[in-house]
Amino acid sequence: MIVFISLFTIFLTVLSLLTNNIIVWWSIFLLMTVVFVLLNKSSKSYTSIFNYFVIQESLGLLFLLFSSGLLQFFIILLKIGVAPLHFWIFNVTNNIFNYALMWFLTFQKLPFLTILLQIFWLSSVYILLMGLLICYVQIFVMKSYKNLLIISSTESFNWIVLGLFFSMFNTLYLFVYYFLLMILLISKFSKSSGYNFVNWETALVFLNIPFSVSFFVKIFSLSEIFKFDSFFTLLLLFSMFLSVLAFSFWLINLSMKNNEELSGSNKMNYFIIFPLMVISII
């Protein structure tokens, strides 16, 4: 079923690129909501399903009502959960775990991303940069492992959206690596073992260790943003220090507890995928 849903999502993504019909786009929104419901029905995450359905379908109706490209652009930003319009995400993620959480943070957003590219508003770059600053402040004040992961994923996705406006091919290529990495990070996160995913590899990835996918996403996007506005680039670099302080909370906890219980943490997969990430530079 997962393979079928993944292929179906890729099909909807290609379809959204081939057409600019609003009715077709709205149909894609509806089908992606159905996909989310199917993935979470087996885990009985009814609260998350209800919240997601109400939010997405309400925004979908507003998307049909407003013919202005600018209003539709903001509606899609809100549907994806791009910062600073990500306030509704926590109402959905509270009751989803494992691969459903990974899907919601990554692949669920792919068809929306290609539609967003087609109705791009140039001045929205400043809104996305402001969203990054808000994410860094939120990361600094949060201490929940799961919420830190969600906010960090939202922040990384903002970088992906920024990069998409500058280079579509490079960003989609990095999105695939980002998707694979999130599979490794979130697959151990479940109701029965809520802290098993917090291992040294996870902490180092979110601290932007060189040659990790989050490192590449930020470097490529910063190099393009610097051509656009050097002041915001400098401000973002200073604000990134807040996220380092927040994720040091993970490092302190890891250094003070027995890590033998984290032995099944996919270490071999990390050693395999990290060298492959270097290829993305070439």
Curated annotation (Swiss-Prot):
One of its GO terms (molecular function) is NADH dehydrogenase (ubiquinone) activity. Coiled coil: none annotated. Its EC number is 7.1.1.2. It is a multi-pass membrane protein. It is found in: Mitochondrion inner membrane. Changing residue 203 to V: In strain: BW287, JU403, JU439, JU516, JU793 and PB826. The chain crosses the membrane at residues 17-37, 58-78, 87-107, 115-135, 166-186, 202-222, 232-252. GO terms for cellular component: mitochondrial inner membrane. It catalyses: a ubiquinone + NADH + 5 H(+)(in) = a ubiquinol + NAD(+) + 4 H(+)(out). Changing residue 76 to V: In strain: ED3092 and ED3101. Core subunit of the mitochondrial membrane respiratory chain NADH dehydrogenase (Complex I) that is believed to belong to the minimal assembly required for catalysis. Complex I functions in the transfer of electrons from NADH to the respiratory chain. The immediate electron acceptor for the enzyme is believed to be ubiquinone. This is NADH-ubiquinone oxidoreductase chain 2.
